[in-house]
């Protein structure tokens, strides 16, 4: 049985600025290699915010989910994190596990 290699990324975030946070995490993760799982903070792309109405995305049209899928493929590692999702009119802090293949759980 081989070891599970996990990378934890706990960094300062830019309050409610998705684009800045996605760029920042891409820079932070640039040197990361040879890992199986990358765990990002809760609500990593906005920092923990109660402004869900303005920041929520749908799973079907999520910039954040597209970014996670791309990064999982680039890093050949699974990602776990959460972000604000609007589903059937309600808001959720939804945890997602993204495989390098692009499958989302």
Task: Report residues per predicted region.
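Active-site-proximal beta-strand elements of phosphoester/diester hydrolases
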Residues: 3-13, 17, 94, 105
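Glycine-rich anion/phosphate-binding loops
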Residues: 19-24
């Amino acid at each position: 049985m081989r070891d599970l290699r996990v990378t934890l990324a706990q960094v300062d975030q830019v309050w409610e600025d998705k684009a800045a946070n996605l760029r920042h995490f891409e820079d932070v993760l640039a040197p990361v290699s040879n890992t199986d799982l990358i765990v990002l903070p809760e609500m990593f792309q906005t920092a923990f915010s109660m402004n869900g109405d303005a920041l929520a995305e749908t799973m079907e049209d999520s910039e954040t989910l597209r970014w996670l899928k791309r990064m999982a493929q680039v890093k050949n590692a699974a990602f776990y994190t959460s972000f604000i999702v609007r589903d059937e009119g309600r808001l959720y802090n939804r945890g997602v596990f993204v495989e390098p293949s692009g499958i989302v759980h």
